[in-house]
C-alpha cells in the first residue's frame, strides 16, 4: 500500500484490516521545508491578492470545492490576463487529458480544479498551490499542497477561506447516503481538524507534523509559515482556563434543545448582546449570557474552537425544514469530559 497522507491512526487501521501484525512500515519524512504555508480569511481584497500572487507566470494549482467555483475562479484569472482553465469531474476524459498535458508543458499556467485532478500527476516545478476554500480534511489539504515544490526549490502554499465554508462541508457529510453513523462521525472529526488548523495561533508546520507524523514535530518554530513570520512582531497569546465558561455554554445548550442556536446567535448570547430577539426568547437569563467580555466576532471564533474539540457540534437540519440553510448547534461527543472537569479547555486570553 502506498499513501502520501496516512496518519498513525490510519496505518494502525490498515494493519488491523489486513489482519497482519508483523508488517514493515517504510515512511519518508512528511516535512517539506521548502514549502511556505499561509492561511487567510477571505476579505474584499482577497481576489486582488490571489491575482497578484498568480500573475508571476509560474506554474500553479487552485483547488476549489465545486465545479462552479472552479469555473468562476478560472474566469476571474483569465480576465486578469492569467493563463487558466477549469478542471472538474464533469468535463470529458479527452478534455481532461488535454488540459493535463497543456498544464504539464506550461502552455496553461494555472488549473482551477477540484480534487478530481492530481492523482498520478508529478510536475516538479509547481511554484504555488492555492486552496480557494476549506478542504474536507487535512489529508486533502496536505495532498494538494504537496504538489508544490517537488523540485526542492521554494514554493508557496495558500489557504483562503470563509468561515461559511463550514456549511458546504457539514451539509455534504449529512447528505452522504452511503455513510453510516461511524463514517459520518469520522468525516466530521476530520473536518474539525481543518477548522482547528485555521484557528491556531501557533506554528502551522508543527501542527501538520503532529497530525501526520508526531516524531517529526520536534521543532519550536518553522520560520516558514504565516504565524512564525509574524511572531517577532506579535506577542504570544496567553492561555487561560475556559473550562467553567464551557460548562455554562453546555448548560445553556441543554436548556434550548427545542429551539437550537446557530453559532452566530450563540456568539451574541455569550457576548451579552441585549437585542430584541434575545430578550423575546428569554435567552438573556441563560447561564452563558454575557460570560465573555469581548466582541461578538471573537466570541464566534472561540465557539468555533469549541467545535474543534467536539464539545459542541454543528448539524445540518433536514432539507426543506425551516432555517434549513443554517447549521444548528448541538452537543458533541466530548462535552461530558469538560462538564465533569476531566478535561480542561485552554484558550488564548480574550
Q: What residue ranges belong to the model's regions?
A:
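Helicase motor core with emphasis on the C-terminal RecA-like subdomain
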Residues: 1-181, 189, 217-218
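Short linear capping/connector segments at secondary-structure termini
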Residues: 31-33, 174, 211-213, 231, ...
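Short helix-to-turn junction characteristic of helix-turn-helix DNA-binding domains
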Residues: 103, 198, 253-257
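Accessory DNA-binding and partner-docking regions appended to nucleic-acid-acting proteins
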Residues: 186-187, 217-350
